[in-house]
Each structure stands twice: as structure tokens, then as C-alpha cells.
From Swiss-Prot:
UniProt GO MF annotations: orotidine-5'-phosphate decarboxylase activity
EC number(s) recorded for this UniProt protein: 4.1.1.23
Name under which the protein is recorded: Orotidine 5'-phosphate decarboxylase
Domain of life, per lineage: Bacteria
PROSITE patterns xref list: OMPDECASE (PS00156)
Pathway where it operates: Pyrimidine metabolism; UMP biosynthesis via de novo pathway; UMP from orotate: step 2/2
HAMAP family: OMPdecase_type1_B (MF_01200_B)
Length: 232
């Protein structure tokens, strides 16, 4: 399992906020307690990509959670554009053609993460979408394909981390959303763990959103999560 020199890097705060101004306020409140931020669709479409570039220039790490999935050339060029923003991580859907294109476009500084199955999905959701395999088997199969193609890491729930690690080896990254501190509500995530449980399961980075962004003291919550992972 890859180790970061800075334990704060293990926590990625999801900036699922309505606009850049709200994101700027949150980042200022958290200060140096957090080094890594995730920007998804909501903020990306509201000026978040320029904000991501500014974060990167200020020394923060950024995770563009855009889940690219398109024809190969479009994905390849999109990945190159993300790399130019100074992003550290970028997500693509774990389809072989998409992953191969992303690897071609990533350059030297960007790491590509494959999204196997959304953590809001359970077996019933997978069946409804037409998949014959249960979620755990689907995640394992896609992780194996990603490793063969040369993807840097996998996004999966903590429940699947052991199976994923077996398939991607010790050097691959595992990034896990659906992380909730003890006592927090699960929200729309169906496969969740606490930060300490996730770290003990071999997770490299955990993604936490509402428990931090909605807290009265987001800096303190972030610090507790980092400490919990260090103690695991």
C-alpha cells in the first residue's frame, strides 16, 4: 500500500458545494488541516475547474471526480486537459476502452482512478441496471482489468477493498468514498465504514463530504478524522 509522507493526504474533502465562493470559504476555515480536495460535477459546472487550478497552484492537491466515459479520443484529450489544471487524481469509469484512453492521456503528474461501481449501488441496483454479477464480483472484475491496463488506482467502497487489493497489488491506490465518522448518518451511501475501519482495511485515501462540509467546526472534524486514521 503506497504511503504518503503527510498523514493529512489520506483525507480528501469532497467540495460538494453550490459555488466557488462557498468552497473558498470552507477551504479558508479548514486551513492547513486538509491538503486534498475533491471537486465533482456540481462545483465543476459552477467555476470549479478554475478553482481547482488555483488550489493546485496554492500547494493543495486536487481530485477531479468527473468519471469520464466517452469515445477514446475524447477521453484521452479530456485527461490531457485535466492534467494541465494541475490535478492529482482524475476519475474515469472502469470500461476497458475508456481506461486505455485515459492512460494514453495522463502524462507524468496525474493519476487515473477507475470507478468500478458507485458506492450508492447495491446488488439490487446492479441487477436493475442489467448486470448479471453481484456488486462484489463486478468490482473485482473491473479492478483486475484496470490493473492490467495500467490504471493507477481504484475507487471502491471499503467493503470491497480487500478483494480489490488482491487484484491490483500493493502499489495500486485505493480511494474510498462513503466514509462516515462514527455516529454520522450514512446519507445516500449504501456501503459505508468509519475512517478508522477504512484505514485498517488498507485504504490509501478516504473521501468525506457532508460530515465535514456541514459541520459547525469543519477544521476540528477533519483533524479528528486524520487522527482516527493515524491510530488505526
Amino acid at each position: 500500500m503506497p504511503e504518503s509522507a503527510d498523514p493529512r493526504d489520506r483525507l480528501i474533502v469532497a467540495l460538494d458545494l453550490p459555488d466557488v465562493e462557498a468552497a473558498e470559504r470552507l477551504v479558508a476555515r479548514i486551513g492547513d488541516a486538509v491538503t486534498f480536495y475533491k471537486i465533482g460535477y456540481r462545483l465543476a459546472y459552477a467555476g470549479g475547474l478554475d478553482f481547482a487550478a488555483r488550489l493546485a497552484k496554492s500547494g493543495k492537491k486536487t481530485f477531479l471526480d468527473l468519471k469520464l466515459h466517452d469515445i477514446g479520443n475524447t477521453v484521452e484529450e479530456g485527461v490531457r486537459s485535466a492534467s494541465a489544471l494541475g490535478a492529482t487524481f482524475l476519475t474515469v469509469h472502469a470500461y476497458p476502452q475508456t481506461m486505455r484512453a485515459a492512460v494514453r492521456g495522463r502524462g507524468s503528474g496525474l493519476k487515473i482512478l477507475a470507478v468500478t461501481v458507485l458506492t450508492s449501488y447495491d446488488d439490487a441496483d446492479a441487477a436493475e441496471a442489467g448486470y448479471a454479477l453481484p456488486v462484489a464480483d463486478l468490482v473485482a472484475r473491473r479492478a483486475e482489468q484496470a490493473a492490467e491496463i495500467g490504471i493507477d488506482g481504484i475507487v471502491c467502497s471499503a467493503a470491497e477493498a480487500g478483494a480489490v487489493r488482491h487484484r491490483i497489488g500493493p502499489s495500486g491506490l485505493i480511494v474510498t468514498p462513503g466514509i462516515r465518522p462514527a455516529g454520522a448518518e450514512a446519507g445516500d451511501q449504501k456501503r459505508v465504514m468509519t475512517p478508522g475501519q477504512a484505514r485498517a482495511a488498507g485504504i490509501d485515501h478516504v473521501v468525506v463530504g457532508r460530515p465535514i462540509t456541514g459541520a459547525d467546526d469543519p477544521r476540528a472534524v477533519a483533524q479528528r478524522i486524520v487522527a482516527e486514521m493515524e491510530d488505526a
